[in-house]
Amino acid sequence: MNKKKKSIVIFTGPSGVGKGTVEQLVFNYDELNLSLSCSATTRSPRGGETNGIHYYFISKEEFKDRIKNKKFLEHSFHFDNYYGTLYSELDNIIARNKVPFLEIETNGAKIIAQKMQKLKNPPYNLITIFLSPPSITDIYKRIKNRGTENAQTIKNRVNKAKEELLEAGNFKYVVYNDRPERAAQEIREILHKELDID
């Protein structure tokens, strides 16, 4: 079977590291044939976010029902909300001969990697990429400049980011986001190698 068809890109890093910015640049490289996997969440949409594009915004009751029915590859609870990757989303992307690109929280990425390691014949080739910030100060500034969180939430996110940075070594690739364009180019090179793109 084609290696590219079975591959899944797991893109993670702390809140405020600039994943969204770098991701947009990576998606400009058409030859990578990526398709963003839309996660489900119970949090409220931020300005400009659309259901089914940025996230599937669902109730906590519906989310818990899907957990019970084993509809998630992974799910986690943080910042008072659930987040998860639906098997159906991955299946739909792979059926279109695209490579699923999951931008997910660090703990969710670890759960997927651990789950695949336990399997004798894992169904996916995982390409795990951790985006690292220049400094914690940069994380603080980015989150504050969003203008969507209060002071306590910002503090919580920065503290969580410090914890997540300790996990960077658990991922196959660590990309330093000193400049988004450079980080995106490095990810492009990683994916060319991993997906056997000439």
Swiss-Prot record:
Organism superkingdom: Bacteria
Statement: the UniProt record of this protein carries the keyword ATP-binding: yes
Location relative to the cell: Cytoplasm
SMART domains named among the record's database cross-references: GuKc (SM00072)
Record GO cellular component, one term: cytosol
Catalysed reactions, semicolon-separated: GMP + ATP = GDP + ADP
SUPFAM superfamilies xrefs: P-loop containing nucleoside triphosphate hydrolases
EC number: 2.7.4.8
Binding, ATP: 13-20
Main location: cytoplasm
Domain Guanylate kinase-like: 6-192
Keywords of the record: ATP-binding, Cytoplasm, Kinase, Nucleotide-binding, Transferase
HAMAP family associated with the record: Guanylate_kinase
Family classification: Belongs to the guanylate kinase family.
Function: Essential for recycling GMP and indirectly, cGMP.
Protein name, per record: Guanylate kinase
